[in-house]
Amino acid sequence: MATSIATGSGKLHFKKICGGQGRRQTYCVSAFAFQRSIQKDLSRSCGVSKFLQVQRCNLSRSPIEENSKPLRTVTTSCLRDGSTKYFDFAVIGSGVAGLRYALEVAKHGTVAVITKAEPHESNTNYAQGGVSAVLCPSDSVENHMRDTIVAGAYLCDEETVRVVCTEGPDRIRELIAMGASFDHGEDGNLHLAREGGHSHHRIVHAADMTGREIERALLQAVVNDPNIFMFEHHYAIDLLTSQNGSDTVCHGVDALNTETQEVIRFISKVTLLASGGAGHIYPTTTNPPVTIGLMVKTWPNNLEVMGSSLGTTTLRIMPKGSYVATGDGMAMAHRAQAVISNMEFVQFHPTALADEGLPITPSKIRENAFLITEAVRGDGGILYNLDMERFMPMYDERAELAPRDVVARSIDDQLKKRNEKYVLLDISHKPREKILTHFPNIAAECLRYGLDITHQPIPVVPAAHYMCGGVRAGLQGETNVRGLYVAGEVACTGLHGANRLASNSLLEALVFARRAVQPSIDHTKSSKIDHTASDWWDRPVVPLSLGSDMLGKIVRRTREVRKELQSIMWEYVGIVRSTTRLETAEQRIGELELKWEAYLFQQGWEPTMVGLEACEMRNLFCCAKLVVSSALARHESRGLHYTIDFPNVVESKRLPTVIFPCALVNNTWSSRQLQNQHMR
């Protein structure tokens, strides 16, 4: 069945795909019969640049940077000119999915890893809990599958769940072989933690900094691989696509070098999107904050930078600034005619640190919420309201070990009923040494603000955390766009269903990054790089002609618009929803976008202009609208999507929401790819 869903300024074509008992029908994604009706594209959005600004100096280096060799820049063999580069594989994103994939395909060709910030600055690096995998004799794949499907409110694709749970242990062993160091027990075996929704201890972890350790190991391997070239501070603008009969084909990506303000065109045989989620459509998120400061970089004499040989060692200081999780991959894929699925399922982590409850209030508002890992509750942490009344047993028999959607809604209900701003998570009844061993990062962060978690409860509040929806992928990470693969949070593989089970995200990224390798290699064997392809599309330009004063005005207005959008999403598209509130959000977002776009063009913005903040804003608008429209299409409450107008689970609606690409009706600049699709 198909339903045409009206949006604020157009329509999207939705289709529900029935799969029965958590299993979707087996099909090749590229064989979808796409709806090409004349309907407006939801991705209408716009934005403004973030360059030519004075940023404060921040020269501190992360442990990953200190322990890694300088990342390789591109050699002339990959260049056509300074602004066009050719690779066998282009990887957008430097988290666990992107790096793991890059290391495998690098055995078969050259790889460009394109990342918008520092290479380590990804959601992976912020992941605390761990990776779930069946490594204990008392556990089983069937147990892990059952826990995943129950947490996903029976919307999971059973075939995907089985594949991921079965292949997980091997992916862990590969990480260990690559040098990742995980916690071990006194018996010498891996220490396996337990988290909410899991029936067994199966979480492999490195204290409460698991993602950081995995990222370190992967980055070190990437540095040592001669076929992988890292392009840091390169922001992906739009995918380069062509139409070949009924097929859309991906040929690479345009990216903005935010250090030099040049647009670089990457032409590749295969492109992997591993760009993460869209947490910054909300004002409070656990996703990485904005990276702002001054970058100092020394280039060795023997390297080529932007196609020019540096005769002497050069010190460059450049302004930088970007958010990480702004939905870039999802929005780019949507504009490129990729299928999007299950965007209504936004996971709010139930326990982010509530600054208002700390003994010492932070001097400034955080750019992101500090995550208190699921493992705290898994280790026996108890949730209380401010009267120290335990409340979770009133909501679910699993109490604190219930899945995230249940715990987040329960906390939200307590806060609204009691008119309070946070609840308390107490682990102080556990031995001090155990707390400090398992949660050193959390203990240190809380102690910065006068809170000793070995004696005091932690103030916590829900925050946007993870997108269960994304670009629809098959079992090998393939999409309906030829040459385009996806892995990690940007993808919707069917694993998570309506709610992600704790510590299944890194697992999914590892499994699908690995599964996408062979079809990618096969695709490169059957395709050639056309060295005239770079001329198929017009090149975006940087708006230097507007001048620094005008750009400053545009940037300030864009930041205001970003906050307005985030406020609308939190107020009307949060943990508990209603049809009226969703419709209000749809209308207000559409109006906000149109007003902002009009402002841009009044200031002299041109259709071909791009900037970091501009592209982030257009992508945030795109993802916000996808979430709202998907939520309006689901007339039931399931998993992370809870609406008071349809409070019950409806068996007949246990179907994934799929947003098919529409025929482009490009009545505004922001509703289309910056480059017109090449016709072949």
Name each model feature, range by range.
Residues 88-113:
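N-terminal Rossmann-like FAD-binding beta1-loop-alpha1 element of flavoenzymes
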Residues 270-297, 311-370, 401-402, 502-515:
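Glycine-rich loop(s) and the adjacent beta-strand/alpha-helix scaffold that form part
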